[in-house]
Amino acid sequence: MASVFMCGVEDLLFSGSRFVWNLTVSTLRRWYTERLRACHQVLRTWCGLQDVYQMTEGRHCQVHLLDDRRLELLVQPKLLARELLDLVASHFNLKEKEYFGITFIDDTGQQNWLQLDHRVLDHDLPKKPGPTILHFAVRFYIESISFLKDKTTVELFFLNAKACVHKGQIEVESETIFKLAAFILQEAKGDYTSDENARKDLKTLPAFPTKTLQEHPSLAYCEDRVIEHYLKIKGLTRGQAVVQYMKIVEALPTYGVHYYAVKDKQGLPWWLGISYKGIGQYDIQDKVKPRKLFQWKQLENLYFREKKFAVEVHDPRRISVSRRTFGQSGLFVQTWYANSSLIKSIWVMAISQHQFYLDRKQSKAKIPSARSLDEIAMDLTETGTQRASKLVTLETKSQFIMASNGSLISSGSQDSEVSEEQKREKILELKKKEKLLQEKLLKKVEELKKICLREAELTGKMPKEYPLNIGEKPPQVRRRVGTAFKLDDNLLPSEEDPALQELESNFLIQQKLVEAAKKLANEPDLCKTVKKKRKQDYTDAMKKLQEIENAINEYRIRCGKKPSQKATVLPEDIIPSESSSLSDTTTYDDPSDAFTFPGQRSSSVPHSPRILPPKSLGIERIHFRKSSINEQFVDTRQSREMLSTHSSPYKTLERRPQGGRSMPTTPVLTRNAYSSSHLEPESSSQHCRQRSGSLESQSHLLSEMDSDKPFFSLSKSQRSSSTEILDDGSSYTSQSSTEYYCVTPVTGPYYTTQTLDTRTRGRRRSKKQNVSTSNSGSMPNLAQKDSLRNGVYSKSQEPPSSSYYIAGYTPYAECDFYYSGGYVYENDTEGQYSVNPSYRSSAHYGYERQRDYSRSFHEDEVDRVPHNPYATLRLPRKAAAKSEHITKNIHKALVAEHLRGWYQRASGQKDQGHSPQTSFDSDRGSQRCLGFAGLQVPCSPSSRASSYSSVSSTNASGNWRTQLTIGLSDYETPAHSSYTSCYGNVYNPLPSPSRQYTEISQLDGTDGNQLEDNLESSEQRLFWHEDSKPGTLV
């Protein structure tokens, strides 16, 4: 029992001691692990700080070159990747650097390329301790080395291909690997000597990739196969071996392709290959044959987003047949997926490869023909031996290159031996640069001289910056008319009213500007364009000055002060004929902007009567440009003058006329009196733009005139088919202002207008209170107020409504034009004026009259019977409805009476011999050709009732020595003695969307001059019959 008990106690003690020991060991181990982890953290933190500290000063990098050299660099934070590539290329004397790049392996094991425009340290370089490993390699491949210009580039391509084959980046079959290994031996060691030497050299040279050794476990078999090919190429030079090696590699399908592992939408793995040919999709087990190949010319767009890379491909086989497709047809998107860093690398590579493809495509025309491979082989053979020996000696040297802030300092690197030829090339290049810089400097000096001369012309003093050669004197500069001025010294800031003080300051400044502008405008020896522009600037300055003055007066009145009396007058030296651009371009967009005054032409569209503006507006008279027949014949166009702007705030000084009279000048009459239309031929010989004006009744004008005195318009050398001069001026006709194009004859005389001479203008001034000017030669407006808009004549530039169209006419139809001398009216009721209001004809009857009237004269065209210029022609008989018999008989009687009276007067005038009226009547001639022969113009009747103006005939008593005032409208009329054709046919069955018409007259220079002389010599007086009735012209 005792022994058993003791054994139990010993076992217990042994177990307890063992437990305590195990517990102690585990505790110590736990403490050791915790302390060790803390020590690791401290050490890691210290190393990290050391790396950060080192990053601020630069980062150590090691560049592996293609010839197995390694360059250690201290890369500074500001160093660009392009500068680093230049540094590496300088160690090879490499000229064609566009094919190469620098790559690195990031923390994920993916290959990335440095972007040349970015800093080196801005890339995601690996954060492993020690120097960062960079690789110098070929980034952009080409079809053949024959396109390379430099032999150094060819050799680097060879070294890059050899490295890619050895690393397995280019997949090659085993038999091809044995051939390539044989060329490597021939290039490095020369011809075959022995198997032992060959086997020894193969172990040192990068000949077998890992994949080949895995396929053939026996190294001796691989070496034997290489020796067999090595014996076959005995006798090849080094250059030939390199060329043959590159020919085989370039034929491989995987040459020049950058592969990236991606997945599709279904998650299946693929290889994405990017090369100079395009983008290909390969099976994960096969990099040789692509499943899909998208050439660069097929791709439309490349983009990536986070983990997705997509390309837009244009496939002509996928043309969409949907009519609702608005985008480009045949486009589809191909998408691949990977991690974000890899997707970005793929996108950068694709963009750079596509840009390289475009650059090569554009520069192919500049690239010379490819060199022969034999020539390349000879170049490589000559430099092979020297370069090989040089590379062997350099392997033993330690190399360290410092790059700081972009400046590259090399110590212990290769001292490249520059040949004399390269030195000469460098010198020539520097001389060219020097020459270009000198030329640029001379251009800058010339520009500086021009600037200094310009400054001297303005200031009168030559600046000291003017460049002078040695012994050269500064040129003498004539100072131009200065515009400098001094402000009033008494103008001091006022604390009482700063706003008024500011206005006063602006007024004084503007006043000085006006004086300066006046000086410039009065400069002699200026061309017409510059002088006109300066006068325009002067006028604008005056306008601004008047605005400031008005603002000052308004402010003073608002503040309860007395307005200042400043005389802002537009000087007389602004000649209206030279500054006519101020009035020629005046248009009224609103009737309220236009005012009408006695002796002033109204706007082309009638509007509501306005009261006279006050005198404060400063409008006392309007300047009109005088036109001459000679100028109009030279310019071959008619000029129509507009009134000067009514909103002018200046007070125009009164200019005395040459005739010594105090009345205002007569405005230029530039309208055709036959139709109150103005035919203005433009550059086109086939079309012209016509704008018809109108004469409107002004209530304020009529109120100022005596009702018992006759009211008429006076014009020289003018003809109108209407001969009424109403004695009361109570009813006027108007024609809407319309613009249209009409066909004009290709050849023929030019049509122009005549202005009133001095005597005629003087006669008119003497009868100012009885004379009214108009904007056209049309009849006064007789329309009733209820036929318009609320009794007010509205202004409109749009064509009239369709209710006023005549459905048998077209505005642009080419037809023989005829116009009987009647007027075109606004609507059905306007302008239907008759001597006896109780027998007014209907609209339909007026329209039928016009048709028959035109047809009859067209049929009688051969007769050419002369007519009295003031006679209303007899209408032919035509059967009509019974309801119209009375009206027709009335008109027939009126016409007969009218013709008898005019024939009696005409027969009485023949006895007067060579009187002024005889010349004038012969000039008047016949009215058969109111339209030009053969002229194709749009026939546009005004309404269904184009009324003809007629007058009642009375006794031929009275003095009619100067009958030119009778029947003449307010605008010019051609003075041709004879006409070549009768009335044309006005009827056209085509519909007419607008109401437009035109008239063209002829002017003969000889007759016109004769008429003008006769008119100047005659006394221009007007006599009225005592027994004339209201509305009757005799």
From Swiss-Prot:
One of its GO terms (cellular component) is ruffle. Residues 576-589, 675-685, 713-722 have a biased composition (Low complexity). Residues 542-971 are annotated as: Necessary for adherens junction and tight junction localization. Residues 635-650, 663-674, 769-781, 906-920 have a biased composition (Polar residues). Residues 59-361 form the FERM domain. Residues 1018-1034 have a biased composition (Basic and acidic residues). It holds the Pfam family FERM_C. PANTHER family: FERM DOMAIN-CONTAINING PROTEIN 4, FERM DOMAIN-CONTAINING PROTEIN 4B. Interacts with CYTH3. Interacts with PARD3. Interacts with CYTH1. This is FERM domain-containing protein 4B. Keywords: Cell junction, Coiled coil, Cytoplasm, Cytoskeleton, Isopeptide bond, Phosphoprotein, Tight junction, Ubl conjugation. The modification Phosphoserine is found at S372, S608, S697, S915. The gene is FRMD4B. SMART domains: B41, FERM_C. Residues 576-614, 635-698, 712-735, 752-786, 905-925, 1004-1034 are annotated as: Disordered. It comes from Homo sapiens. Member of GRP1 signaling complexes that are acutely recruited to plasma membrane ruffles in response to insulin receptor signaling. May function as a scaffolding protein that regulates epithelial cell polarity by connecting ARF6 activation with the PAR3 complex. Plays a redundant role with FRMD4A in epithelial polarization. There is a cross-link at K882, K1029 (Glycyl lysine isopeptide (Lys-Gly) (interchain with G-Cter in SUMO2)). SUPFAM superfamilies: PH domain-like (SSF50729), Second domain of FERM (SSF47031), Ubiquitin-like (SSF54236). It comes from the Eukaryota. It is found in: Cytoplasm, Cytoskeleton; Cell junction, Tight junction; Cell junction, Adherens junction. The lineage of its organism: Eukaryota, Metazoa, Chordata, Craniata, Vertebrata. Residues 417-450, 531-561 form a coiled coil.
